[in-house]
Amino acid sequence: MRTDRGTVTAWALWDWGSAAFNAVLVTFIFSVYLTDSVGATLDSRFTPTTLYGWVMAVAGVLIAVVAPLIGQRADLKGTRHRSLGVWTFITIGLMASLFFVRNDAPVWFWVGAVIMAVASVLFEFAEVNYYAQLNQVSTEENVGRVSGFGWGRGYAGGIVLLFICDFGFVAGECG
């Protein structure tokens, strides 16, 4: 068990980097693009936001059922670190694939929604392993401080990335 400053910082940087998923994709930018722009092509009695909510709800149920099993498996096999890397790598690939979601046909809404749902499930699998490592990078005396340090890095990463997205991409399209 390494609890030195470098190990804790490396652990917390995953939170910094993973903030891109929740801040940019799930909450503020891609989900809005998917429901407001891509979803405008849908011919449905339900709004795109409702349909997207249902898809993400299915993902949430899957997370609730499967994530504990994924975490338990990684704990028993001692593969937390490797599992974190694998789930993160696959999530990054899914995030990159969202680049190809266009707003010119209804099928793209469903492609984007399914990719987001799968990515959400796999991202949470990664988070299970990330949080399970907290006991490996902290002691009983500093677990709260280390956890808060990681949590704070996550928020900071999300804010920085949202500024980059807003000023680098979104604001340019609005003005």
Predicted regions span which residues?
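Hydrophobic alpha-helical segments of secondary membrane carriers
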Residues: 14, 54-55, 87, 115, ...
